[in-house]
Amino acid sequence: MQQLLNEILDEVRPLIGRGKVADYIPALAGVEPNQLGIAVYSRDGELFHAGDALRPFSIQSISKVFSLVQAIQHSGEDIWQRLGHEPSGQPFNSLVQLEFERGKPRNPFINAGALVICDINQSRFAAPAQSMRDFVRRLCGNPEVVSDSVVARSEYQHRSRNAAAAYLMKSFGNFHNDVEAVLLSYFHHCALRMSCVDLARAFCFLADKGFCKHSGEQVLNERQTKQVNAIMATSGLYDEAGNFAYRVGLPGKSGVGGGIIAVVPGRFTVCVWSPELNAAGNSLAGIAALEKLSERIGWSIF
């Protein structure tokens, strides 16, 4: 496995320079684009990694999975009264579909859906940002995971579209807490800094029927785990989920920080990071690396 990871990084490294680092979040625009890392973590606790897999980066929308899991833990099936679990087919920050469907987001991984999930968690936790940080620390076993306040502040200063979505949902009665407070929590979640190794470890419960072996925690039950993996498979890569299923064939979740987490149910989790994005906002070299890994090992679930 170690040799394979090294080979794959060598093969996809020439793609660096063909994508573009996210620049709509000013604090992310200065990230060094040449970085590339990958980590594989097995349900039995074996870890393999290569490249910049130990270097923390801004996880951005990957945090939406953690938020969803927290909401499921405390509110169960009730959350689906306020949002769906269908692919949207629209840009992740689109307002058109939200207006047409009367303030009920299609799924928890578009921005509007993630904001509803944060609104649910805001009602549950006295300090949502701290609760999320502590939850993630337990899952990955790294007490040093923190939220980058500079990135969070930068995102808050450029919050107009997310605020518009939140206020639109509030006008339809699907947003219960103070919008600005929820936005602050949401941006602190997105600004969490984790490495490929951290994320591969943190997501291992989704490869093991909801059980996190290194923390000893039953995070979700088996049915809930299948549901989260299913939503990742259909909606985890913005409006490129179909292409990812075609090329990689695994449940996954991406973020504009350049990270992608993928789950091989019953076996492994894989995290890859390369900051340069394609036109859909997903890591260009990251998808290529996951495609090669899935092909060579035969990991596709299809």
Curated annotation (Swiss-Prot):
Gene Ontology terms for molecular function: glutaminase activity
UniProt-listed GO biological process terms: glutamate biosynthetic process; glutamine catabolic process
Keywords: Hydrolase
Residues that bind substrate: 61, 111, 155, 162, 186, 238, 256
Recorded catalytic activity of this chain's protein: L-glutamine + H2O = L-glutamate + NH4(+)
Enzyme Commission number(s): 3.5.1.2
InterPro entries: Beta-lactam/transpept-like, Glutaminase
Keyword Nucleus: no
Alphabetical list of SUPFAM superfamilies matching this protein: beta-lactamase/transpeptidase-like (SSF56601)
Top enzyme class: hydrolase
Top-level lineage group: Bacteria
Keyword Lipoprotein part of the UniProt annotation: no
One Pfam short name: Glutaminase
Subunit organization: Homotetramer.
Family: Belongs to the glutaminase family.
NCBIfam families (UniProt xref): Gln_ase, PRK00971.1-1, PRK00971.1-2
Name this polypeptide is given: Glutaminase
